[in-house]
């Protein structure tokens, strides 16, 4: 209220400090929107706009919190590292193609580690962090590529190669994609890890990749596609 009375234009409500890091930059165990009550309390006593991040991970959640009056503006931090086109995709009605931040904190882990190497941070969801100037060459010319396994690596390759103009088929021996993520997401409150697989599947298919399940990558099976390249 004092800040509001001093003619501050807006207040951005966050929480915690370095000593309570997990309440500032939450890991996967925290529920999206868990600290919206903080912004709501501030709004009760000020007449200026209130901004808050509130662990927002979807446009639907952002819109709901605005409608509830929890806050006046939405702040996005890590979601824009995971997908710099987050806002653009919402404007274009392509919300289903957003690569969601899974709250794994690899961005901060890598930045702290790489600070001593004078390099950049990384992201588990966005391999182009720090490599934004690299443009995908559309040089696939329809060449056939067979990818063995629909885990995170295989699906990432499928999406990027499809965007480059390759004819991509992914062979997955199980009934569902995900690989090791299907184990990693099982502990309580680790469900967000599955988002990266869901988002990769959506974007890989939209780019033109085909995924075949219950398919073991035997040599005879692979040869049926006459691939120019095989990734395993």
Q: Which sequence ranges carry the predicted segments?
A:
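Short glycine/proline-enriched coil/turn segments at helix->beta-strand junctions
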Residues: 46-48, 165-166, 207-209, 225-227
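A conserved short coil-to-beta-strand element within the FAD-binding core of flavoproteins
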Residues: 212-225
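Short amphipathic alpha-helical segments and helix-helix/interface helices
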Residues: 39, 87, 201, 219-222
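Flavin-dependent oxidoreductase catalytic cores
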Residues: 1-148, 152-163, 168, 176
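A short, aliphatic-rich alpha-helical micro-motif
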Residues: 68, 204, 222-225
């Amino acid at each position: 209220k004092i800040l509001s009375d001093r003619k501050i234009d807006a207040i951005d409500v966050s929480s915690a400090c370095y000593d309570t890091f997990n309440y500032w930059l939450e890991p996967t165990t925290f529920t999206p929107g868990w600290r919206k009550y903080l912004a709501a309390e501030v709004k009760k006593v000020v007449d200026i706009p209130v901004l808050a991040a509130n662990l927002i991970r979807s446009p639907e959640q952002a819109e709901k919190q605005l409608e509830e009056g929890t806050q006046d503006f939405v702040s996005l931090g890590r979601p824009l590292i995971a997908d710099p086109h987050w806002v653009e995709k919402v404007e274009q009605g392509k919300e289903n193609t957003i690569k969601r931040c899974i709250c794994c904190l690899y961005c901060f882990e890598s930045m702290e580690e790489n600070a001593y190497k004078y390099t950049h941070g990384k992201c588990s969801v966005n391999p182009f962090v720090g490599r934004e100037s690299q443009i995908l060459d559309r040089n696939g010319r329809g060449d056939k590529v067979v990818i063995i396994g629909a885990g995170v690596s295989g699906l990432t390759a499928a999406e990027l190669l499809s965007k480059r103009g390759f004819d991509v088929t992914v062979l997955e021996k199980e009934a569902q994609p995900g690989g090791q993520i299907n184990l990693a997401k099982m502990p309580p409150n680790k469900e967000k890890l599955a988002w990266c697989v869901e988002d990769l599947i959506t974007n890989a298919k939209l780019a033109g990749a085909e995924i075949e399940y219950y398919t073991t990558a035997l040599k005879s099976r692979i040869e049926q596609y006459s691939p120019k390249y095989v990734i395993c």
